C-alpha cells in the first residue's frame, strides 16, 4: 500500500532493446509462441528491476511481450489477420479482425502480472486497450463486415472478453488496471471532431462501453489513460485542451483519469476544476517523446501548476504516455531510465514541500 503523496508510475510500455524487437517480429511472422514466451520470461525481470531501481512506486512489465498496446488483443483471441492497410497515406501492417473472435489465450494480462509478482514487491499496474480504440484500429469495412457488419458490432463483442480479462487481473491482485484510449482523447481537437457526423455520440459511446466492462467489479483501482497519440520523436496527432471531453469523462465509473500535460498543446490545468472531485488525477509531467531529459525541477514546476487547482492527495506522477506503445519505437532505454529516475526525484521534492 502506498501511503505517501505524489506516487509515481509509468504509463506502461518501456523501450525494448533491438534483440527483443527482433524476437517479437520473428514470433509474429512464425507464430512460435512457446519458444518466445520461454525466452521473454528470462528477459522481463530486467525491465521490472529497472523501474524498481529508479524508485517507481507502481510498475509494469514494460509491455515487452507485446507487439503493440492495441494488437495484444490478437494474442488473446483468434479471428485476426495481419493485413496491409493505408493509414493517413502510408501502408502499414495491422491486425484486422476477419473472422469470429474466440478467446485462445484468456488471462494473458494476469499472467503478465504474475511474472512481475515473482520479481518485485512493488504495486502492479497492467494496461488494457479500450474496446472503442480496438474497434477504431482493427475493424475494416472491406475485411471485417462479413463477420461484424459494423464497427459497433465488433466493439460490443469485445466487451465480455475484456471484462473477463479485468476480473482475472483483479483476482491476481493487481493494484491498477489502466485502460488506454488515445482515440477518445483525439476528440479534443476540433479538426478531428469535424470528421464525425455526431462526435458527442462517439465520445459518449466510448465512455459507455468502458462502464459496461467494469460494472460490478471491485477490488481493483480503475484508470483511464488519455493522450494525443504518441509518435515518438515525430510528436503527436491532435491538439487542444481537454474541456470538450470533460463532461463525458465525468460519467466514467473509474477511479483515476490520466492526462498528459508535458506537451505544449494540452491546454491549461485549470480544466481540472471541471472534473468531478471523486477522480484521482494521473498527471503527465515527464516528456516521453523528445530527447530532452526533464530535470526534477522542471517536473516539479509542472506538478505545481496543477496544484493550483487540485489537492496533492489526488495526484499521481507519470510520463505523458508509454515510451514504446509499439515494439518498433526507437526511444533509447537509458533515456527512459533517466527520465523516470528524475520523476521519482521530483516526487521526493514535492513530498518534502507538501507532505504534512
Question: At which residue positions do the language-model features occur?
Answer:
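Domain-level signal for soluble alpha/beta catalytic cores
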Residues: 1-356
Amino acid at each position: 500500500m502506498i501511503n505517501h503523496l505524489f506516487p509515481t508510475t509509468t504509463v506502461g510500455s518501456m523501450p525494448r532493446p533491438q534483440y527483443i524487437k527482433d524476437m517479437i517480429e520473428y514470433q509474429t511472422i512464425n507464430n512460435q509462441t512457446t519458444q518466445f514466451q520461454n525466452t521473454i520470461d528470462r528477459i522481463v525481470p530486467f525491465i521490472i528491476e529497472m523501474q524498481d531501481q529508479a524508485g517507481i512506486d507502481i510498475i509494469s512489465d514494460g509491455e515487452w511481450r507485446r507487439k503493440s498496446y492495441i494488437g495484444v488483443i490478437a494474442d488473446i483471441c483468434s479471428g485476426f489477420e495481419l493485413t496491409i492497410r493505408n493509414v493517413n497515406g502510408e501502408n502499414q501492417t495491422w491486425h484486422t479482425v476477419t473472422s469470429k473472435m474466440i478467446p485462445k489465450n484468456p488471462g494473458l494480462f494476469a499472467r503478465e502480472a504474475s511474472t512481475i509478482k515473482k520479481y518485485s514487491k512493488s504495486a502492479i499496474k497492467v494496461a488494457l486497450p479500450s474496446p472503442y480504440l480496438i474497434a477504431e484500429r482493427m475493424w475494416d469495412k472491406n475485411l471485417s463486415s462479413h463477420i461484424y457488419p459494423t464497427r459497433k458490432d465488433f466493439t460490443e463483442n469485445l466487451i465480455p472478453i475484456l471484462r473477463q480479462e479485468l476480473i482475472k487481473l483483479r483476482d491476481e491482485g493487481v493494484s491498477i488496471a489502466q485502460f488506454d484510449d488515445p482515440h477518445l482523447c483525439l476528440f479534443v481537437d476540433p479538426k478531428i471532431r469535424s470528421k464525425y457526423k455526431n462526435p458527442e455520440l462517439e465520445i459518449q459511446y466510448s465512455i459507455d462501453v468502458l462502464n459496461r466492462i467494469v460494472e460490478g467489479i471491485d477490488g481493483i483501482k480503475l484508470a483511464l489513460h488519455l493522450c494525443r497519440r504518441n509518435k515518438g520523436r515525430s510528436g503527436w496527432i491532435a491538439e487542444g485542451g481537454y474541456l470538450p471531453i470533460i463532461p463525458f469523462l465525468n460519467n466514467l465509473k473509474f477511479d483515476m483519469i490520466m492526462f498528459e500535460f508535458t506537451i505544449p498543446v494540452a491546454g491549461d490545468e485549470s480544466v481540472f476544476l471541471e472534473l468531478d472531485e471523486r477522480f484521482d488525477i494521473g498527471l503527465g509531467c515527464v516528456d516521453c517523446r523528445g530527447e530532452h531529459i526533464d530535470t526534477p525541477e522542471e517536473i516539479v514546476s509542472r506538478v505545481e501548476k496543477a496544484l493550483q487547482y487540485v489537492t496533492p492527495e489526488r495526484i499521481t506522477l507519470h510520463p505523458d504516455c508509454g515510451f514504446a506503445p509499439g515494439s518498433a519505437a526507437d526511444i533509447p532505454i537509458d533515456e527512459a531510465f533517466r527520465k523516470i529516475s528524475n520523476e521519482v526525484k521530483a516526487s521526493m521534492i514535492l513530498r518534502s514541500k507538501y507532505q504534512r
